[in-house]
Amino acid sequence: MDFPDEWTQKEFMQNKIKLEKEGVKVVLVDTILSPIEKAETTTYNPHEFKNYPDGTVLVFYCDSGKATLDRLKEYKERFPQHHCVSLKGGRGYWRKNMMLLDEDVL
């Protein structure tokens, strides 16, 4: 799979389901110490990421998505064994009650 620089919330949810069925770990990474309600997140911890399997997808988020997109090159250099993506719109655009319908799943 070719990974773009950004995923929307819907793309994140779709790709998480698809990739985890294929055995690929997908992690939503909190860079602002502010978890997203009703979402499984992990706090940014570079030492912990070293323990993740190679090929893990790290989806970084901040308040607006701008800071993580600006730092994406740095994340990709720091974690070359993983795929790094920024969450478009960040925490501010996350819809806590958004659900995927069967036809939405890739």
Segments (PLM) and residue ranges:
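Compositionally biased low-complexity segments enriched in polar/charged residues
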Residues: 39-45
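Catalytic cysteine-centered active loop of the rhodanese-like fold, especially the PTP/DSP P-loop
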Residues: 46-96
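N-terminal beta-loop-helix "entrance" segment that forms/cooperates
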Residues: 37, 96-98
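Conserved beta-strand segments of alpha/beta enzyme cores
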Residues: 27, 40, 83-85
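Active-site neighborhoods of enzymes that stabilize oxyanions during catalysis
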Residues: 98-106
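Flexible, polar/low-complexity N-terminal or interdomain linker segments that lie immediately upstream
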Residues: 1-38, 106
